[in-house]
A protein has these predicted regions:
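Terminal, low-structured helical/coil segments at or just beyond the last alpha-helical repeat
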Residues: 1-4, 149-176
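Structural marker of alpha-solenoid helical repeat scaffolds
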Residues: 6, 40, 74, 111-112, ...
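Alpha-helical segment of the N-proximal tetratricopeptide repeat
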Residues: 7-46, 50-57
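Residue-level recognition of tetratricopeptide repeat
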Residues: 19, 53, 87, 124-125
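Alpha-helical adaptor scaffolds
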Residues: 49-61, 66-117
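TPR/TPR-like (Sel1-like) alpha-helical repeat modules
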Residues: 76, 127-128, 132-150, 176
Length: 176
């Protein structure tokens, strides 16, 4: 995995303040702090990652998609760009949807086979698309890369996976 230069003061202060504002539930102030980071660091993966959270927190999915694309271009070796792009595509009011999210995330799995959230999200998308056999396969792949009881508990609260809930219960990983 590629190494990215660390942010340095004063940009670290703005970055920390942005994270603080997000923690307080104020994405607008977080965005203002990110905007204060010097131009040469605006494309830093950490800055883009937090900027995506700001956009998502404001339900600005077109902007979130643009930021995810920038992150993917800047740091294709990080799973966050792939995940953010598919998440934004799923929620995009026009030109997006579950199938677009599925198609965008599917190529990420071979690059990040140990990243549990990728097969988990693919299982969710497959369920929503009515591809239950594929959903089962993706969910089992996710189980292999994570704490199975924790993942099953999370899945049993995830409406996207509702068609698989009876099977997830039967896995014996979680007490009903």
């Amino acid at each position: 995995m590629r190494s990215y230069p660390p942010l340095a003061p004063p940009d670290t202060h703005c970055f920390a303040a942005a994270a603080g504002w997000l923690g307080l539930g104020n994405p607008r102030e977080a965005e203002a702090e990110l905007d204060a980071i010097r131009p040469e660091f605006q494309q830093h993966p950490d800055v883009l990652d937090v900027r995506w959270v700001v956009c998502a927190g404001q339900d600005d999915w077109p902007a979130a998609l643009r930021v995810a694309q920038e992150l993917l271009t800047t740091a294709p070796d990080l799973p966050s760009g792939w995940l953010h792009r598919s998440y934004a595509l799923r929620r995009l009011p026009e030109g997006g949807g579950v199938e677009a999210a599925w198609n965008a995330l599917l190529p990420a799995y071979p690059q990040f086979p140990e990243e549990q959230i990728i097969p988990y999200n693919l299982a969710c998308y497959a369920c929503l698309l009515g591809k239950l056999d594929e959903a089962r396969d993706w969910f089992h792949r996710a189980l292999k890369t994570s704490d199975a009881p924790r993942l099953c508990a999370m899945a049993l609260g995830d409406e996207d996976l509702q068609p698989l809930w009876p099977e997830i219960h039967k896995l014996g990983q979680v007490k009903a």
